[in-house]
Amino acid sequence: MSSLLEIKAISKKFGDLVANDKISFTQKQGEVVAILGENGAGKTTLMNILFGHYKCDEGEIFFQGSKLPTGKPGIAINAGIGMVHQHFTLAENLTVLENIIIGEKSLLSLSLPKKPARKKLLELSDKFGLP
């Protein structure tokens, strides 16, 4: 089975605080991976690097065999990498469709035409029997 995701020696520091110290792992296609650790262990920092929110100080990420630059959320999104936060909330000032769009795309995409997203939302609603 081929590798879906390879994290190679990822390190990230905030001043003197070492959040990630040469973290490496491989996730194969179809595998489910859980990252466990105490509060402050660096789990969220690692996820923020993977999703492009932070640039790592050292190391590399490969997604489906291609190097994924860190610190570039648009590239992670285009590769299909996303995250559901542990404590997520919906934005009350947005419609259901807009909340779904920002769960998949960046906030900038709210200014783009919503017709393709609406079509996809309706298809998924039908597929899963949602009103």
Describe each model-derived feature in a short phrase.
Residues 1-131:
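Glycine-rich phosphate-binding loops of nucleotide-dependent enzymes
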